[in-house]
Amino acid sequence: MEQLQPPSPYTYNRRQTRDSEEHAEALGEWDQVYDQLSPGAFEGSLVDIWFEGLQVFRETTNRSVSQSGTTWNGCYVVGIPVNMKGPGLFSKQVLTRDSMLTFHSDQEFSLTAPEGFDVVAVAVPEKTLMEAMQPGSSEELYQLFPKSPKVMVAAPGQLDELRNCLLSILDPASFEPELLAYPQVQKAISSAIIGHLAEVLTSATQAPLPTRSFKGRCHVVKEATNYALTHTTEPITVADLCEKLNISRRMLNYCFQDVLSTNPVHYLRSLRLNGVRRELRQPGNIPGSIRDIACKWGFWHLPRFASEYRALFGELPSETARNSRN
């Protein structure tokens, strides 16, 4: 009788989240910031599995969120939407359900996800991908699979096969994670994922590039956002942004509407409210510090601030602070 091999190490994490920042922190070995953009209580879920050097995960978010960050060193990431209520924006490129996002750990990514965003993804060591795709050199691999964040398209059948392969592993109703204790199971699943991934990437092409005018509007939005977030101690106004970027109020509004389907006042207020929320969630806050934090982020009318905060997050600032202390 063949002797069973000893159990192989793996990790399995399944979580339900009630806060965008909590959700960002839940994904192992990623350094991320999430900002909630659409109003209402946040609900998210995450299934995160590590085995055979791979990270496979599925995450869902019910609210539109802005995401940015980096992942663990030396890996490529491929993400495939499962469901989404409208298109997303990945590093100035439109993301749909029929496309996939890709990037290397050397590069920071940015994603504006719509409401009802459900995505499966795999992070693969570069060496593993090299062995599977067998390019002649790293340069050839980078031509097939650029390091910079890209939206790619592939044959629908191949993309569906990879998506379904990942879903079959990440669905708690159909997969028992304890099976990963068997090295044979790990090897079989890893081989299936890498095989589908190599097929998809070999035939994938970059999605149609946005027009120069759209890229220009994305640049305006990014510059406006960066300026506002680096001047949190100042009550930045739309007029300030127009002066800084040397554009008209009408053009600034048009850029935000076209890229993010919102206006600059609403978007920048949402980012500031998220900044307040992150500070309120820090342990050690004392009663009365809510006013200080709100003023720090430029909110001077406290009743209006509390109303806007509750409209975005579904709870009052005092509730956030109280929950963080508990």
Q: Where do the PLM segments sit?
A:
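Alpha-helical bundle regulatory/interaction domains
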Residues: 1-41, 87-232, 237-239, 243-249, ...
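A short glycine-rich, His/Asp/Glu-containing loop-to-beta-strand
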Residues: 22-25, 41-63
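Glycine- and acidic-residue-biased ligand/ion/polar-headgroup-sensing regions
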Residues: 52-54, 61-89
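Generic hydrophobic, amphipathic alpha-helix propensity
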Residues: 217-221, 268-273
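Active/binding-pocket-proximal capping segment
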Residues: 242-254, 258-259, 269-275
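Short hydrophobic/aromatic patch on the recognition helix
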Residues: 252, 256, 304-305, 309
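Alpha-helical DNA-recognition elements
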Residues: 258-259, 311-312, 323
